[in-house]
Amino acid sequence: MAEITVELVSVERMLWSGQASIVTAQTTEGEIGVLPDHEPMLGQLVENGVVTIQPTDGDRLVAGVQGGFLSVSKEKVTILADFAVWAHEVDSASAEADLNSDDELAKARAEAGLRAVRRSSEGL
């Protein structure tokens, strides 16, 4: 199976680095899927978007992201997010409460996290 190297990094931490068969991301130009040997490109991630990674040796990973960029070369996909959280790390009850927060950053992060949870439960 063909594979591509993927790195998902936020301002706060490195979330994942490894080999994947496909990566999908929501960009300002729409949702894109990146397979091995994809044409090089640079994309801007949407606010409150979702990134999915299908590792070659494991279960699909889903992250909620808050802005950033996606860089694609023939051999590597690098996702640099302002904020990112794995769907399994999201406390849905707390995130739902944060949607009503006056803190815009907390609200935005909650939206990104909840979108990741929804995408993860879709099983796509």
From Swiss-Prot:
Keywords: ATP synthesis, Cell membrane, CF(1), Hydrogen ion transport, Ion transport, Membrane, Transport
GO CC entries: plasma membrane; proton-transporting ATP synthase complex
SUPFAM superfamilies associated with the record: Epsilon subunit of F1F0-ATP synthase N-terminal domain
Primary residence: membrane
Signal peptide start-end: none
Membrane topology type: Peripheral membrane protein
Family matches, as CDD domains: F1-ATPase_delta
A GO molecular-function annotation: proton-transporting ATP synthase activity, rotational mechanism
Location of this chain's protein in the cell: Cell membrane
Known partners and oligomeric status: F-type ATPases have 2 components, CF(1) - the catalytic core - and CF(0) - the membrane proton channel. CF(1) has five subunits: alpha(3), beta(3), gamma(1), delta(1), epsilon(1). CF(0) has three main subunits: a, b and c.
HAMAP family in alphabetical order: ATP_synth_epsil_bac
UniProt record similarity statement: Belongs to the ATPase epsilon chain family.
Purpose: Produces ATP from ADP in the presence of a proton gradient across the membrane.
Protein name: ATP synthase epsilon chain
Originating gene: atpC
